[in-house]
A protein has these predicted regions:
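ATP-dependent carboxylate-amine ligase catalytic core
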Residues: 22-29, 34-44, 70-156
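Short functional linear segments
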Residues: 1-53, 60, 66, 70-71
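Nucleotide phosphate-binding/pyrophosphate-handling subdomain across enzymes
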Residues: 45, 134, 139-144, 152-162, ...
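Short Gly/Thr/Asp-enriched flexible loops that form oxyanion-binding sites at enzyme active sites
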Residues: 64, 149-159, 405-409
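C-terminal helical cap/extension that packs against the catalytic core
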Residues: 198-220, 291-294, 334-392
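Active-site-proximal loop/hinge segments that shape catalytic or ion-binding/gating pockets
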Residues: 398
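Hydrophobic alpha-helical packing residues
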Residues: 64-69, 132, 254, 363, ...
């Protein structure tokens, strides 16, 4: 099998949440536990840091990985979803897993996998953990896929757990209140393993304290610590300030655990995060005139901060190219759109996309003037054609809109 034949096989044979949604979601860990047994317990073969949260867990994971890389540690990084290439999910020192390793893993385990009814995410976790163990990483930063308690990554016993914040997202799976969602994400808190909470919230603080007490897990609230200033970083989204604070507090705690992380390593980790880890799609400027920015924010909380930052920018016209998936509360998101923005609606190229006719109806219900397009590239082209040098074009609403955009760049 070639690499592309391998991916075609996996996409066709294994249910993938990012593409099809609920049909691929499993509410238990048994398949992952069975997979780890088949692979001879790779999750026990490397040290790790486990990162959950509604927003910011991807950026935080990349920042922590970058700091460890600057300190000279061989650093694994597992994140999801990918934007362009599946291998973005699995990296060591910023380098994607080789294509032949992916193909080799699938070919050698294909028969066993077919009997286990694995999801795409379970399979990718198995590949990542097997790869990190075989390559003898010093540490792996592992981002939760969704939730925490029942996420496939939750077979780890890490050095440190991080929960960035709790908001309303994936409520059909994790619960319809912030408290219920916090309960799910708190499932990554392990016996005697310290946990850093990025944001203390009235509805969740008691839940985290109760569970950490039950687990004898030291708990640190990052926003109770106020750094004089943050290190320089190419990550310019206003929402990153909370992630910076969470990362700094986590790094300081890891230093106390004995990891050789100096202030210089931390500072350089922030400054070189994009270069070290190839993080993309976080308030990423793709063009200067007119300015084109993309961001993977995809829920009300994340897009509220994005819209505020766009509104504050000096500009002539604001052009918004937006598309969504079909399991988000899009009506609430559409209320955030500035009334003076020029709106281009589109449909990302995945089965889980919110169909353009439904999005057009929702926008009309909100009295939003708009034009609509069947794909992201056409919407972006229209925005570019209508713009002058002093305008700002923002592309987002979904990770998969950004993925479609970047795949053409």
């Amino acid at each position: 099998m070639t690499y592309h034949e391998t991916l075609d096989y996996l996409y066709q044979q294994l249910p993938m949440y990012q593409r099809i949604g609920k049909a691929a979601y499993k509410a238990d860990l048994q398949s992952t536990i069975d997979l780890m047994k088949l692979l001879d317990a790779p999750e026990k073969g490397f040290k790790s840091i486990h990162v959950a949260g509604t927003n910011g867990k991807g950026s935080t994971s990349h920042l922590v990985a970058s700091i460890f890389q600057e300190a000279g540690y061989k650093t694994g990084l597992y994140t999801s979803p990918h934007l362009i290439d599946f291998r973005e999910r699995i990296k060591i020192n910023g380098e994607m897993i080789p294509e032949e390793r992916v193909t080799q893993f699938v070919e050698s385990k294909k028969a066993a996998f077919s009997e286990m009814d694995l999801s795409f995410f379970e399979w990718s976790v198995g590949l990542a953990f097997d790869y990190f163990r075989s390559e003898s990483v010093d540490i792996a930063i592992v981002e939760v896929g969704m939730g925490g308690r029942l996420d496939s990554t939750n077979v780890l016993t890490p050095e440190l757990s991080i929960i960035t914040n709790i908001g309303s997202d994936h409520s059909q799976y994790l619960g319809d209140t912030v408290g219920k969602i916090a309960q799910e994400k708190a499932g990554i808190i392990k016996k005697n393993v310290p946990v850093v909470i990025g944001r203390s919230q009235r509805e969740t603080e008691g839940i985290f304290r109760k569970i950490s007490l039950h687990q004898d897990a030291p708990i640190i609230f990052a926003d109770h610590h106020f750094p004089d200033e943050f290190p320089r970083s190419p990550l310019k989204g206003n929402y990153q300030k909370e992630n910076f604070q969470t990362t700094l507090v986590a790094a300081q705690h890891l230093k106390q655990q004995g990891w050789n992380l100096t202030e210089e390593h931390i500072s350089n980790g922030f400054e070189n995060v994009v270069k070290n880890t190839n993080l993309r799609g976080r308030w990423e400027t793709l063009q200067e005139s007119p300015k084109v920015i993309c961001d993977v924010a995809h829920n009300v909380e994340g897009l509220t901060i994005i819209m505020d930052q766009l509104q504050a920018m000096p500009r002539h016209e604001l052009h918004l190219v937006l598309g969504f998936v079909n399991d988000k509360n899009v009506s609430d998101i559409l209320t955030l759109i500035p009334k003076d923005a020029i709106l281009y609606l589109c449909e990302p190229s995945i089965p889980r996309a919110l169909r353009i006719d439904k999005l057009v109806q929702l926008a009309s219900d909100c009295d939003l003037k708009h034009t609509s397009y069947n794909d992201v590239a056409s919407a972006v082209d229209a925005a570019q054609s209508a713009s002058i040098a002093q305008d700002v074009i923002f592309v987002g609403g979904s990770t998969f809109v950004v993925a479609d955009l970047l795949s053409t760049k």
